[in-house]
Regions:
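Membrane-helix interface segments
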Residues: 14, 221-222, 309-314
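Transmembrane helix boundary and interhelical loop/hinge segments in multi-pass membrane proteins
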Residues: 199-214, 218, 222
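Secretory targeting signals
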Residues: 26-82, 129-206, 227-306, 326, ...
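Central hydrophobic cores of alpha-helical transmembrane segments
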Residues: 20-23, 311-324, 340-343
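Alpha-helical transmembrane segments of multi-pass membrane transporters/translocases
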Residues: 11, 15-18, 22, 292-300, ...
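Internal alpha-helical transmembrane segments
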Residues: 1-40
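Short hydrophobic, aromatic-rich alpha-helical segments embedded in or entering the lipid bilayer
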Residues: 336-357
Length: 396
């Protein structure tokens, strides 16, 4: 029965068009991603072609490894010399400043925990400051834990998380991962909308074609057939999401490379409480996107099962992931509520920057894991209600 239901789904012309559109958009997004990084060569010529990211990685390869205080001191000295000699468009930028851009950003991030990005900090650092760099990092971690921890339990939790950061930091150029995280987030929203549209049709099509009487009169129409429809929705979600993400990832990483997979995210956001490498960060983003698609599928199927039409159901994913963020910004007085909406699943990039935590009893949870658990449970919990909605209709 499952095979037959899947055949119905994937043979429907509008669904084939939607899936084809998803795959075409994956290719288009790949094109944007692989040409989004900027590389300046030794002659000062800037390029953004498909090989720009690999060239950028090669340009920064000399700095791969452990960033000791001595290494950081060399970076500061090189930065000061370069700034006095050239601007970004000059040839010196490509050979002097560009290779250390990531490391410069890391130093600034560590030294300005509560301030905006300020390059002037690099010109104010002394040799003594550099030799005490990681000590300063530790002290600032303690201040951050004290500032964002509202209770003693929260403060201890934040201190524990910060202590998980391995110092000195290991560096490798992470441009491809940083770029991909941005594009995979946007693409996951598109996949969630497409999944919601296709899954809504699973329960609405029988009513639209007036075949519901035949469906309910069959031997398994009251039980197994409905369960099969629900299972088909889950399988369809997995298939579409995996096809799209795998295609996007294979194209982009195949062209840009996977350099920086083990580089800690703290290279970019020094005081993030999400202690992870860029590879783990990408996986987190992909998993959150999958949960978003599963939630979209469950809600769309439930609405379609109750209303017997696809028109309202297809709007649900668009509302959850496109409109709700704007509503949240408009209703700034309800920040606590909007920090737990489904949009977080498709906006991981913004959430990992903020040390937002919640406490229930003596248990402390970070925002993203809490949201992941909440909406995974919700997506699964809605499935029995879909089944019951169809049973209620049949008993009329």
């Amino acid at each position: 029965m499952l095979k037959l239901e899947l055949k119905r789904i994937f043979s429907k012309k509008i669904n084939v068009f939607a899936i084809g559109l998803a795959l075409i958009l994956a290719v288009i997004f790949s094109g944007f991603a692989v040409t989004s990084n900027r590389y300046v060569d030794e002659n000062g010529n800037a390029s953004t072609g498909i090989m720009a990211t690999r060239k950028l990685t090669d340009n920064r390869r000399a700095w791969k490894g452990t960033l000791t205080e001595d290494e950081l001191g060399t970076v500061i000295e090189q930065n000061k010399n370069a700034v006095t000699q050239s601007s970004e468009e000059n040839a010196i930028y490509g050979t002097t400043l560009q290779p250390i851009d990531d490391i410069r950003g890391f130093i600034i991030s560590v030294l300005t925990p509560d301030a905006e990005y300020d390059e002037s900090v690099l010109n104010q650092i002394t040799e003594e400051n550099i030799q005490e760099f990681y000590d300063t990092y530790h002290k600032n971690m303690e201040k951050m834990a004290e500032e964002y921890g509202k209770t003693s339990v929260q403060k201890k939790y934040l201190e524990k998380k910060y202590n998980e950061i391995k110092l000195p930091v290991e560096y490798e150029s992470y441009s491809s991962w940083d770029t991909m995280i941005m594009y995979v987030e946007t693409y996951s929203i598109i996949l969630a909308i497409i999944v919601g549209f296709i899954c809504a049709g699973i329960f609405a099509d029988d009513f639209q074609t007036k075949a519901d009487a035949v469906f309910f009169s069959t031997k398994y129409g009251r039980t197994k057939a409905v369960k099969t429809k629900i299972l088909a929705g889950v399988v369809t979600t997995v298939m579409i999401y995996c096809m799209g993400i795998i295609l996007l990832s294979v194209i982009c990483f195949g062209i840009m490379g996977t350099s920086g997979m083990n580089t800690p995210y703290q290279m970019y956001q020094a005081y993030s409480i999400y202690i992870m490498s860029y590879g783990q960060y990408y996986l987190l983003t992909v998993v959150c996107g999958f949960i978003a698609s599963m939630l979209a599928a469950s809600v769309s199927m439930l609405v379609a099962a109750k209303m017997h039409t696809i028109s309202v159901a297809v709007c649900i994913p668009f509302f959850l992931y496109c409109l709700l963020p704007f509503i949240g910004r408009a209703l700034s007085g309800y920040t606590t509520l909007f920090n737990l909406i489904p949009t977080i699943l498709t906006n991981v990039q913004a959430s990992v920057k903020v040390p937002l935590i919640y406490q229930i009893g003596n248990c402390v949870f970070r925002q993203i894991p809490l949201v992941m658990v909440m909406y995974t449970v919700m997506a699964i919990a809605l499935l029995p209600f879909i089944y019951k909605s169809f049973r209620r209709y049949r008993n009329k």
